[in-house]
């Protein structure tokens, strides 16, 4: 058993087993597990949202700074670092939730593999304490009794698109996961005030006009906002339905959490962004 299995897969496996022992439905267990994960990550996610808010707030100042030092790239870089410090923004801090989510998603995939193709290994991954739960102990002894369906109608070990055809319920989950990813990205994306396309900026650069880095970044972010959901959709249709369900619930909760904070805690975010500016 690899270190990843010990550190990531086994805890996820046993948490799911514990939930399954209470509600013997794989889909419902994944939903409850995802809710637990999202709320455990909520403090980090909220900080990420604060970062996005501060980024938006500093955009006008950043634009002025870039115009001021347009002929001195070294001075511009130093000034930009000072500006990030002023607003207490860490360029990579906003990626923290995503980086934590990635091993969890891989862990869920491994757990689905175990339940779908290696049920004889259930005992190998189950903690002794968890195996003492009667439902779990019976499942370890009788692996074929595992209910891999969601609400009794959808096999979550299947793929949305396979050689056997299309599983429309799982395809719907893949679409919803991509949709919520898009909506969440739009919530935190910097406000774009330019209608220019990347090709327009590149064409201007060829003519000798210096590209506005903030403008380029905004254009690239806009492209990524559209590309990532499409990429996620194609990934989800190639993986077991349990992963599509996990990502749908996870992205859906993230969208609702962001919406709640942006609507009800706008004053709090403004205060935090302003306090970051004063530091």
Name these PLM-found stretches.
Residues 1-279:
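Helix-loop-helix
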């Amino acid at each position: 058993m690899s270190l990843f299995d010990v550190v990531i897969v086994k805890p996820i496996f046993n948490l799911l087993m514990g939930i399954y022992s209470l509600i013997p439905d794989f889909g419902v267990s994944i939903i409850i597990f995802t809710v637990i994960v999202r709320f455990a990550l909520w403090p980090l996610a909220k900080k990420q949202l604060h970062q996005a808010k501060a980024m938006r707030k500093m955009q006008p100042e950043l634009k002025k700074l870039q115009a001021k030092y347009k002929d001195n790239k070294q001075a511009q870089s130093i000034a930009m670092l000072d500006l990030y410090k002023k607003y207490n923004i860490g360029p990579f801090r906003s990626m923290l939730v995503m980086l934590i989510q990635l091993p969890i998603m891989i862990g869920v995939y491994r757990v689905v593999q175990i339940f779908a193709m290696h049920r004889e290994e259930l005992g190998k991954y189950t903690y002794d304490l968890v195996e003492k739960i009667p439902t779990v102990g019976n499942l370890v002894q009788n692996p074929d009794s595992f209910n891999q369906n969601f609400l009794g109608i959808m096999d979550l070990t299947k793929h949305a698109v396979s050689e056997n055809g299309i599983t429309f319920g799982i395809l719907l989950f893949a679409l919803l996961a991509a949709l919520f990813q898009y909506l969440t990205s739009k919530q935190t994306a910097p406000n774009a005030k330019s209608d220019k396309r990347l090709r327009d900026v590149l064409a201007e650069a060829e003519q000798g006009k210096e590209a506005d880095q903030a403008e380029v970044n905004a254009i690239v972010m806009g492209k990524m906002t559209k590309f990532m959901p499409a990429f996620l959709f194609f990934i989800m249709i190639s993986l077991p339905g349990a992963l599509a369900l996990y990502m749908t619930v996870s992205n859906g909760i993230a969208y609702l959490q962001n919406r709640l904070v942006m609507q009800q805690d706008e004053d709090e975010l403004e205060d935090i962004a302003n306090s970051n500016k004063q530091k």
